[in-house]
Amino acid sequence: MRGIYLVGTDTEIGKTVISAALVYILCKAGYKTAYFKAALSDAEELNGKLIPGDTEFVCSLSGIQEDYEKLTPYIYKTAVSPYLASKIENKPIDIQVIKDKLTKLENEYGYVLCEGSGGVICPITDVDNKIYTLGNLIKDMKMDVILVCRAGLGTINHTVLTVSYLKNNGIEVKGIIVNQYEENRLCKDNINMIKKMTGIPILGVMPYINENKKNFIEELKYNACNIFKADEIAGLMKEV
């Protein structure tokens, strides 16, 4: 079983879009791949049941047919971080449950792509003044990371600091994916500086796609197939 964690440098940078793109090309190429997101907030309620939008989107795009609760153990309605939502809704997160669910997926599928719930330093739990972060989970599960960053203003600082934190905590960054790229001098220079300052390979550059466009899904699939190579992504996944 092979897996990898996809982590973002900031909020609203399109981790789920990139996750969906990667899972889509892996499944399309014949790799039996699952998607996993430990906790999700801001879920919509439908017929008395919470629907994890990110998980629904990835499954819809890639064709994965699984119960959402199997892929996302903790689902919250409140539109704050999953950690805070768990406190507000009095539904605590159990780290062991997350680990067990992920291990079960790893045993059922050949490949698992995990999407981080927030950034690498974001807390998942705070029990008895012991803060457990996404980074702790990644390290405990012995996984490597693909880092997603935005192309625009501010990305150099966010990306270099995140890479530094991951390296200092013994987590290997296998590559960087630049999202929301626009054809201008700023974005080009940002990518060049990120390569120079981190020494991490750029796995792909995804152009900005308006999610409200009528043909958003078709455009995302087209770009995914033209930007990423399934064999390369699968090869980055560490045996766990």
UniProtKB/Swiss-Prot annotation:
InterPro entries: DTB_synth_BioD (IPR004472), P-loop_NTPase (IPR027417). Its EC number is 6.3.3.3. Its cofactor is Mg(2+). Substrate binds at residue 41. It comes from the Bacteria. Pathway: Cofactor biosynthesis; biotin biosynthesis; biotin from 7,8-diaminononanoate: step 1/2. The active site is at 37. GO terms for molecular function: ATP binding; dethiobiotin synthase activity; magnesium ion binding. The keyword Metal-binding applies. GO terms for cellular component: cytosol. Keywords: ATP-binding, Biotin biosynthesis, Cytoplasm, Ligase, Magnesium, Metal-binding, Nucleotide-binding. It is an enzyme of class 6 (ligase). Signal peptide: none annotated. Catalyzes a mechanistically unusual reaction, the ATP-dependent insertion of CO2 between the N7 and N8 nitrogen atoms of 7,8-diaminopelargonic acid (DAPA, also called 7,8-diammoniononanoate) to form a ureido ring. Belongs to the dethiobiotin synthetase family. Homodimer. HAMAP family: BioD. This is ATP-dependent dethiobiotin synthetase BioD. It comes from Clostridium acetobutylicum (strain ATCC 824 / DSM 792 / JCM 1419 / IAM 19013 / LMG 5710 / NBRC 13948 / NRRL B-527 / VKM B-1787 / 2291 / W). The gene is bioD.
